[in-house]
Amino acid sequence: MENNNNNNINKTNTPNNSFSPIKNRIEHFERMSSSPNISIPLSQKEYYCSPKKNISLNNINHNINYNNNNNNNNNNNNNNNNNNNNNNNNNNNNNNNNNNNCIVGESNIINNNKDDYNSNNNSTINYNIVRESNSNNNSNNSNININNNSNNNFEKEKIIENNKEYINSDFDSISNNDNNNYNNNNIFIFEKIEYNKEEIDCVIAINSDIESNKNDENDDNYKNHNYEIIIVGENNNSKEDCNSSNNSYDNDSNSNSDISTSVNCNSINNNDTIDKNNSTNIIKSIENNNKNNYNKNNNKNNIKSIFENILIKVFTIIDKESSKLIQGLKIENKLKSQLSYLEEDYIYQTVLAILQTKVLQVIFNDVFPNSNIYNDNENNNNNNNNNNNNNNNNNNNNNNINNYIVEESNNNISVIDNNNNSDNNNNNNNNNNNNNNNNNNNNNNNNNNNNNKSNNYIVEESNNNSVIDNNNSVIDNNNNINNNSNNNNNNNNNNNNNNNNSEQNFTYNEKKIQNPIIRCIRNLREIRIKKIPKNIHVDLFQDYRNIQIIHNQFPELFTDSINDCYKIFHHFCLTYSGPDVKQFLCEFSKIGVISCSDENENSSLYYAIENKVNGLQLVCEMVCNGLINIEMAKKTNKHGHSILCKCINLKNIPILKLLISFGFDHFEICQNCKNTDQDIQDIFDDIYFSMAYFSTIPDSVNGKLIKTNIALLTELIYSQEKLKLLFKVANAPVPTEIEKAVNKFIFKMDDYKTKYNLKKNEIESIEKVGIIDKSQLSDFSIIGEGGFSTVHKATYINLQNTITPVAIKSFKNYDDDSFERIYKEVSVHQSLQGENILKLIGVSKLKFGLSIIIEKCDMDLKNFISCNQINLDLFFILSTQMVNSVSQVHNHYPEAEINVYHRDIKLENWLIKTIDGNHTVFISDFGLSRSNTESNGCTLQQIRGTNLHIAPECYKGFLFSSQSDIFSVGISLYQLAYKLVYGKFVHPYHEYQIADEPENLNIIQNTGLIPTIPPNLPSRLKRLLFLMMSKMPERRPSIKECIEEIQKCKEEYESDRTKWDTEISVHEDYSLLNEQMINQYHYIKSDVLDYIRDFDLNQNPHDNYVQELESFDYSSYFIKCKSFNEDR
């Protein structure tokens, strides 16, 4: 979903969240001038239903009576209480119950109801139905009234018969209390939905709130409604496609089970009335004018239909038998793939929570069989309402929910502690003082002064808010139950009526548990509260907008010292791993908690350092933007530890470099860290040089150019047990009688032809490979090991009894990807032929897995150069064969104009064999080699090879080419030339102290650095190395030109050996960052710019490089590096 919020969000306005049924939205819409339809922004689909009753939105009370207890003798109704007195007495029921029953069960609607509207209907029923609403309506609101034009009462039996009792089973709490309005705000329509050409029984509950402007209460323009549509029903045969454009609602049907969905709809006009005769449009949803909130296509925007379909599928399976939970889990996995585009959406989270809760329910019942987790404690005390005294002592507070009220939001678990409000049950004959009714029967005046202001408890199950008032909080849903008793008899007690209410509530709760949605969500909340501490700071910041909303509406949370708001930010720095770091810091900076320290004097940086995902970016943003007091952050904590010490202990070198570059004192590391002198010196060396190029790696801070090592991730994902299993399967012993048959036909089976992505020519090459029997190999011993394979040496006896020393390359993994790589390597290696290409003898199935048998050499070229002195004669022998071997690979198919690229050229992959003093160089390891065919286009665009040897264009996503291999050959020849001049072997870029790390590789990619070529080389040889390592592929010579140039250098040397020997005589190694390095880059820059003037780059894909080259000041860069080196 798109988020159109700016970083600088006004505190007074609620941000524009993208559309989701569970998110709070405060929107105002234009009134409809002429149409009787009600315009509600629901989605980009339109839904229609027909009315069953005539509903007026002007009288907003919903009163339908189960029990006809109204006495119509001169009733004086005061303050919305139908106090019926048979003796013509005035019953003043001053019920100051703000928030009487708005927060129950899964509700999160906040109703600060202050204005009560009159209800004049004779047949009422009070529904206290609270769903998983997500609206946050702090409005001066009252009840919703369904005006029944007839005088007939709706009997309970009739409603149950017509609606299969799904009212009681689907909603949270129903209090059937006579003549007592609980500020309910729900309209109910019992309809039938036409869904995918089938009919579904449903109940539609329209939740309405009125928001009035206190300054102008008479102006209807300031009144708005907030609607919630709740659909209950099931369709066992529903199809997956739920994108129907119309859902028609009819009147008559029965429902079969409980499936529900809810959609919040905002803001209709107060004066619009739904007419009974208008059968087309009670509710019509149209596209919202604010298009920014609906940037989704039609298939994704039909949230309601998708949610209906998913719930139907899920509960069709999991509600049949609890033992079939495995089917529910399969559905869960299926939903993950089907709803991948809704990963952060309400639908995805809710459905998975319900599925998981169903499993947890069974597990919990098995572990705690005696737990009353599914009992509704809020009604445990209903039967305590029996009071047989002659006075009207109404023990209302025993009906309160005194056990627990826990609400779960997507961001927080909020808990209300049970305190001592349950001690309000006083059985004195005349006075009930603790929040009870003071009833005096002597004068027949029942003054029910219920001062049970439930202002101390507001619990939200909102996506954005979780609030708790810290007073002795008990939700008094039943505070007014006994007020009904004052409406019936003057001298008789109302205990019977109270008992009736208790029975009704008890019956309701028995049925309510049958609803799978409410039950699952309630169970999930109950199970989670046993594991999560009662702390408001837990997971508060799932969305940075929540911080602003909570701060605006409940600022006391951020000012109360008890809550310690800075802990919220410290917890954020420690654990947050998502995006929008800058927006979060913007919101926290407005609150003013970023610079706060905890009780141990640890600043926010202490916690950000431990964040393995966003730690570097958090520290960089806070320090660079001045959000934190650096001078305070530099100080040590109570334990004498500094931030730099913590970086060392956590081995977080990148943050350590960053902090030192901003002026943190690095000498305290020596004083406080238990490191050896050499360790500290190495750290300083790394820090000083990193400061020189720190300005070149802002992209690495944001993680844009850091490449993930997929192989490493895969290895980490696999558990050790699975790896052992793979090895066990791969190395399973083969019976002797069939081993020869398996070896003989291992490459003749048909499965590898279809199972792996092999081409026709590759299959033909594989079939030509010889199969070597295990008995022909002996004398195994390991000689080397790499990241993907292990090399053994052995003795091979062929059919002519000729003994040949061989090398055996076996692989560490034998999954499908590994087998495909093995087959491709065998295919390429078998097809290549040349005097400088290592010979492939065959393959064999050995105890350590499928292995490749190759010709054995003495050692690789890296070890040879390290162990031997190099002179000019040996230099030309080795260099000539090195470039010849690459030429034999590149030009293997000249007639077909197909080149094979090695893609992993380095000294380790050249092998050398010495016979009678004659050195022969072979190129090997063709695991990454591919041809430049069209089918290999994607493969050649991937980054493959060894870091520090890969050509710069490969990092930028360009196709691999023969010129990319030339760059790698140039790096290897540089290492050979360095040993020639200075007498020691070095790694590429050693003079810059660049290790094989992502941050350092970023420098090579962005600056065009190449290894410093020894200045004592003859100019012709020096220029060849410059060209081979050029950043521009077009500037590099072809492999044929390299062979010719080396041959000319050799001829020049042979014509004047004395001159060359004098120039190439062993010199002392130059110090780092010397003038030669600066002069070299001036030469590179001028040389490349000359090339640009002679070459048309309009059609060249590397023109971006030219702009980078012209804008980059090499001299200032290296002068800066040099100054840091001299300071040392």
Swiss-Prot record:
GO terms for biological process: mitotic DNA damage checkpoint signaling. The keyword Membrane does not apply. GO terms for cellular component: cytoplasm; nucleus. Residues 777-1054 form the Protein kinase domain. The active site is at residue 904. Residues 1-21, 60-100, 131-151, 236-256, 375-504 are annotated as: Disordered. Pfam families: Pkinase. GO terms for molecular function: ATP binding; protein serine kinase activity; protein serine/threonine kinase activity. It catalyses: L-seryl-[protein] + ATP = O-phospho-L-seryl-[protein] + ADP + H(+); L-threonyl-[protein] + ATP = O-phospho-L-threonyl-[protein] + ADP + H(+). Its EC number is 2.7.11.1. ATP binds at residues 783-791, 809. Residues 1-17, 243-256, 375-502 have a biased composition (Low complexity). Keywords: ATP-binding, Kinase, Nucleotide-binding, Serine/threonine-protein kinase, Transferase. Belongs to the protein kinase superfamily. Ser/Thr protein kinase family. This is Probable serine/threonine-protein kinase DDB_G0283337. It comes from Dictyostelium discoideum.
